[in-house]
Amino acid sequence: MLEPKWLDQAICQYEMPDSQELCEEIIERLKYSTRWNQSATVGGVQPYSRESDQISFQEESPPVEHEPILSFAQQCLENYLEKLSDAKNQPPFGLVEGYNILRYQGDGKQGYHAVHSDHGYPDLVHRHLTFTMYLSDIDEGGEIEFPTQGVMVK
């Protein structure tokens, strides 16, 4: 049974059970990829806010090793909607964009998180829900900040 840790009235954190080996496998497979690009924001690269590289994946064809994580994300979404009944009073949910895996540079960070679209598509600017998952292999750092809510998540 999923039990989120609530950090704010709308922000919660889920732990994927027995995920360490899977996360290590994904990190190892991506380590030597030639697909890494500097992370960008709408309007272009803003290195002061994103000290990371990223690889983008399409939602309709994820790598097989990502499937357990995406399945867990679906379970989390269902649990979140069950816990927050107001979230159900919205247009239907769907994955309308691909996803990124980020690699932080040194002691880099994701300096902010807000309602924005990395790719600039007008429909994505008004995201209803954002899902962030960490495949962290470090003990310190790697937080993401939600400044509007005053929340830091690791």
Could you tell me what each predicted segment is?
Residues 1-154:
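Fe(II)/2-oxoglutarate oxygenase catalytic core
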